[in-house]
Amino acid sequence: MIRGRMQGCIGVLCGVMAFAMVSVSAGEERVRESWPKVEFSAGTWISVGDTRWAHDASSVAGLGNPTSKLTYKDVGTNVIDLTGKFWFSPRVFGRLNGGFADIGGGRLTDDDYGTGQRLFSRTISNIAGNNMYYINADLGGRVKEFPNHRGYLDLFGGYQYWHTEHQAVGIGQVVCDPGAIPGFTCAAAGTSSNQGETVITNTANWHSIRVGASTEYRLTRRFSVLGTLAFIPISVLDNEDVHHLRGDLQQNPSFSMKGYGVGADVDVGARFMITKNLAANLGYRLYYNRAFSGDLTIHPAVGSSESFPLTQFESLRHGFTAGLSLIF
């Protein structure tokens, strides 16, 4: 099913590109002003992140729906962001963008539920690392230029890879209700253990097709506002979760998740031309992906694996951006 949806979305992407190229061909002769050949941008994305997932193993007696819900929230993740935009003609361009960062810190909240959504256990752990990075590769075309050289409208489509890895350290028991799941035990509320020890590592990978539009409108000769909106009609999720203290589970991984969903990328901001070829940029960016269908597979140390419905998986990252652009 994922393959079929991906093929369909690739068809849509090709259609958008075909439309853009037709518009490009029709507009080539109307271009009068000089056009940039290359634009290099370097900057930072001062971001916070949120990754959360849940699954339903209520087919097992005593367990609730959701059975487990894990929420990773990180702060202080300062991304180094680099972009190269290359114009093949006055109307056709390719763009390659990438960013990487170490996770600055944060918190994991791990909830487990019994029948009737009765909270059995809640633990918290500090997020000590690890990293995130992304790559966007787009092909686009200029379909509209505003009068008096005020700006433009571009359409584009391409591929996005987005990777986030969180490492959770130590365990603080916040809630423990042994009666919620008969036969299961948990540490007493208020206790702490495994301080300084990595207890969970979660690695989320999203592979996405995206289509969108970018625009810039010049308010003065030097100052302009700009924005980019990309819709992700298909995003394929590959997630692995390792519970390092669980001797009853494999360690590579303990849980694996596969799914597909949708998403969106948004960039808004302002640009000030310092010189003819140098610009300063300031803005705000948001990435969001959400799985609508998927499965979680448990990998026991002994015995065969077992799968359950993945009821939630979401990745969100947002924050302020700032940088410089060289335009030639």
Where do the PLM segments sit?
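Extracellular/periplasm-exposed beta-strand and loop segments of Gram-negative cell-envelope proteins
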Residues: G49-T77, F100-I135, Y161-W206, P233-D267, ...
